[in-house]
C-alpha cells in the first residue's frame, strides 16, 4: 500500500513538468525548425516555377512579400512571429482603441481575455492570438475615441480653422483698443486739477479783502471775482486755502507760546520817578529870570525781558539833571 501511494506521488511532477515554460518553448522550437525546412524546399520549388524572366521588379517585390507572410504565418506560433515581424494583415492607417501599438500602427492584434483564470482576467498564449474580425474591430473602434493618424488632419481644425483663426485675430486686434480705453478711463479719473496762477495785483487785492473779512457772502464773492477777472469758484477756493493757512499759523503760534518759558514774553511797565520843578518856586531866590523849561516828555514805557525793573532814581546823574540845566545860563 505505501508503495502504491508513493508511485502516483512521484508521477505527478512528471505530468506537471510537461506544462513548464521550458518544455513549451522546446516543443515550439522543434515545430518551427521542421516548418522552416519544409518551407525552404517549397520556396525553392516555387522560385523555380514562379520566376518568369520578364517579371516587373514591383511585382517581384510584392510576390516576395506574400511568400514571407505565408512562411511566417505557417506552423505553430506563426501568427506571433508575423505580428512581431510586422508581416501580418495591415489595416488602413487610422485611429485605434487601446492595447494597439500606437494609433494607426501596423498591427491590429488584440490579446483576448477570458474569465476563469483564478477568478480574474488571464490572457491566452501567443499561439491562440488571432486578429479581430470586422464586427469586433468596428465595435472596438466605436467604443474608444479616435486619435489622428500620421497623415490625417484633425476635423475640427479643417472645418473650423479659418473661422476660429479670424475670430482670434479679431480678438487680438481688439485687445489693445480695450486696454487703451481702460487706461484712458483710469487716467481720466485720476486727472490732476489745473492750478490757477494769480498775478501780484490779484493776490494783493485778495489779501487785503481777507484781512477785512475772513468769509465772503455770495454777492461779495461775485463782485470781487468780477473786479479781478476771475471766476467765483477760483475766489472761493482761494479763500478756503487762505483760511486753512491762517488756522495753521494760529496753531503754530499757540504751540510755540506753550513751549516757551513763562517769563520770556512778559511786558513790564516802568514809571518815570522824577518831575521838573515849577519855575515859580525858584523865581524869587534867583536874581535873573530862568529860561522857560522844556516840555516834559511823556512817560516812557520800557519793556524788559527779565522780571526786574530798574528805576531811574538809582542813577545820581539822572537825578541832578534839573539843577545842571538851571545853572547853565548863569555860567554863560
From Swiss-Prot:
Residue ranges with Acidic residues bias: 42-57
Biased composition, class Low complexity, residue ranges: 161-170
GO molecular function: DNA binding; DNA-binding transcription repressor activity, RNA polymerase II-specific; RNA polymerase II transcription regulatory region sequence-specific DNA binding; sequence-specific DNA binding
Residue ranges for the DNA-binding region feature of this UniProt entry: 191-250
PROSITE patterns per the UniProt record, alphabetical: HOMEOBOX_1 (PS00027), HOMEOBOX_2 (PS50071)
Chain span(s) of sequence motif HMX family specific domain 1: 251-261
GO annotation, cellular component aspect: nucleus
Motif (HMX family specific domain 2): 264-277
Pfam families registered for this protein in UniProt: Homeodomain
Database matches in InterPro entries: HD (IPR001356), HD_metazoa (IPR020479), HMX_Homeobox_TF (IPR051300), Homeobox_CS (IPR017970), Homeodomain-like_sf (IPR009057)
Tissue: Expressed in neural crest-derived tissues, including, nerve ganglia and cranial mesenchyme.
Biased composition (Pro residues): 89-98
Biological process according to GO: negative regulation of DNA-templated transcription; negative regulation of transcription by RNA polymerase II
Localization terms from the record: Nucleus
Record's keyword terms, sorted: Developmental protein, DNA-binding, Homeobox, Nucleus, Repressor, Transcription, Transcription regulation
Ranges of Basic and acidic residues composition bias in the record: 125-139
Residue span of region Disordered: 28-170
Domain of life per record: Eukaryota
PANTHER family for the chain: HOMEOBOX PROTEIN HMX, HOMEOBOX PROTEIN HMX1
Family: Belongs to the HMX homeobox family.
Function: DNA-binding protein that binds to the 5'-CAAG-3' core sequence. May function as a transcriptional repressor. Seems to act as a transcriptional antagonist of NKX2-5. May play an important role in the development of craniofacial structures such as the eye and ear.
Protein name: Homeobox protein HMX1
Amino acid at each position: 500500500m505505501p508503495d502504491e501511494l508513493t508511485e502516483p506521488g512521484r508521477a505527478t511532477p512528471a505530468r506537471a513538468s510537461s506544462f513548464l515554460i521550458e518544455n513549451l518553448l522546446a516543443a515550439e522550437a522543434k515545430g518551427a525548425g521542421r516548418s522552416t525546412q519544409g518551407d525552404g524546399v517549397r520556396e525553392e520549388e516555387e522560385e523555380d516555377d514562379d520566376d518568369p524572366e520578364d517579371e516587373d521588379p514591383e511585382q517581384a517585390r510584392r510576390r516576395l512579400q506574400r511568400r514571407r507572410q505565408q512562411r511566417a504565418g505557417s506552423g505553430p506560433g506563426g501568427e506571433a512571429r508575423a505580428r512581431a515581424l510586422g508581416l501580418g494583415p495591415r489595416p488602413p492607417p487610422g485611429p485605434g482603441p487601446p492595447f494597439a501599438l500606437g494609433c494607426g500602427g501596423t498591427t491590429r492584434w488584440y490579446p483576448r481575455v477570458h474569465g476563469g483564470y483564478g477568478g480574474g482576467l488571464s490572457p491566452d498564449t501567443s499561439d491562440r492570438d488571432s486578429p479581430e474580425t470586422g464586427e469586433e474591430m468596428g465595435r472596438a473602434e466605436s467604443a474608444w475615441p479616435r486619435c489622428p493618424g500620421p497623415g490625417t488632419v484633425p476635423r475640427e481644425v479643417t472645418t473650423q480653422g479659418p473661422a476660429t483663426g479670424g475670430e482670434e485675430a479679431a480678438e487680438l486686434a481688439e485687445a489693445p483698443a480695450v486696454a487703451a480705453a481702460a487706461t484712458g478711463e483710469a487716467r481720466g479719473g485720476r486727472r490732476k486739477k489745473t492750478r490757477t496762477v494769480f498775478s501780484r495785483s490779484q493776490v494783493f487785492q485778495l489779501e487785503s479783502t481777507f484781512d477785512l473779512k475772513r468769509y465772503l457772502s455770495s454777492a461779495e464773492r461775485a463782485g470781487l471775482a468780477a473786479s479781478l477777472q476771475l471766476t467765483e469758484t477760483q475766489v472761493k477756493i482761494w479763500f478756503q486755502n487762505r483760511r486753512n493757512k491762517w488756522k495753521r499759523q494760529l496753531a503754530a503760534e499757540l504751540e510755540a507760546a506753550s513751549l516757551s518759558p513763562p517769563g520770556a514774553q512778559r511786558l513790564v511797565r516802568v514809571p518815570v520817578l522824577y518831575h521838573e520843578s515849577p519855575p515859580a518856586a525858584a523865581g524869587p531866590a534867583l536874581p535873573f529870570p530862568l529860561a522857560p523849561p522844556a516840555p516834559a516828555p511823556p512817560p516812557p514805557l520800557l519793556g524788559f525781558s527779565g522780571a526786574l525793573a530798574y528805576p531811574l532814581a538809582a542813577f545820581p546823574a539822572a537825578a541832578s539833571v534839573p539843577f545842571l540845566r538851571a545853572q547853565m545860563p548863569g555860567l554863560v
